[in-house]
Each structure stands twice: as C-alpha cells, then as structure tokens.
C-alpha cells in the first residue's frame, strides 16, 4: 500500500493509515448536488455477519468497491435488519457527523449524530424495520452523511445552524432471502 505513514486516497475520500481492514465504500451513484462540498471522511459498510461488502484490488494497491449501497437482506420473518457502518476521520481536526435517511418510518440510525476525533473511527448501526410496506421499499431510499468542523458545542447545538463541510449519499437496496 505504499508508505504506511500516509493515507491512501481512493476516489474522493481518504483511507486511514495503518488500518488494513478498513475498506472505504468508494464512490457512489448518488453524486453531490451542485455546490455541495466533497466528503472528507471514510465510510466502511459491513453486513450483519460483519463481512465487508467491498473488495481489495491488490494489483493496483487500492481498494475498489464491489457494492456501492447499503444492502438490507430481508427475511420472511419480518424481523428488523441492521447494517454496521464505520466512519473514519483521516483529517487533523475533530469533526461532527450527522446521518439522515429518506424515511424515519422504516429506518433508524444509531447514533444519528456525534463526533469523530482525528484519525479515529466510530461505529454506526442503520436499522431497516422490515415490515410489510411494499410501497416504501419500492421508492429510491438513501442515507446522507454530513460532516462539519467541531467548535466545542454539543452535536445538537452544532447542527442547529452549522455549515456542512462534506456530503455523501449512499442508496439503500433491499434483497430477498427467498
């Protein structure tokens, strides 16, 4: 991977140094809107069994994404499904993050906002309620990840009127286990 002391750039994000198992989710089909700032943090998605949904391309010494979305494997028993996510801050400053979803009726994000210190990683769980709402899953759902610089206020106070420093959207996908 080159020099272990320097971060490795992948797409428009930066991967953390010395974390071989951290594979960034890569670019997404949902591009930023005009004027939105580039996302500077790294996101890693794992399914319920903690297996990464990204693969490493050893020939090019970089990570490439196999799946560029949050996938929920829906079961017949209609139990809620979770996806574990890790958010890494490769910058030199503490940042606050916020995760939004397209429907609070069918998704939950725990925690929806918080802080990530420089060179640290936080865990986030996204839940899909998995109820019989066929019209809900037929829509194009996505999760929006935002970050801004921290200034000492609480996360709620900070997000009440802060300027977004980076944006990234990942689409949701629903897979049947039939």
Curated annotation (Swiss-Prot):
Q: Which Gene3D superfamilies match?
A: Immunoglobulins
Superkingdom of this protein's organism = Eukaryota
In the UniProt record, the signal sequence range is none
Q: Which residues does the UniProt record annotate as the domain MSP?
A: 52-177
- Pfam families, sorted: Motile_Sperm
Check the record and name the InterPro entries matching this protein: Ig-like_fold (IPR013783), MSP_dom (IPR000535), PapD-like_sf (IPR008962)
Q: What is this protein called?
A: Uncharacterized protein R05D3.5
Origin species: Caenorhabditis elegans
Instruction: Show the taxonomic lineage.
Output: Eukaryota, Metazoa, Ecdysozoa, Nematoda, Chromadorea
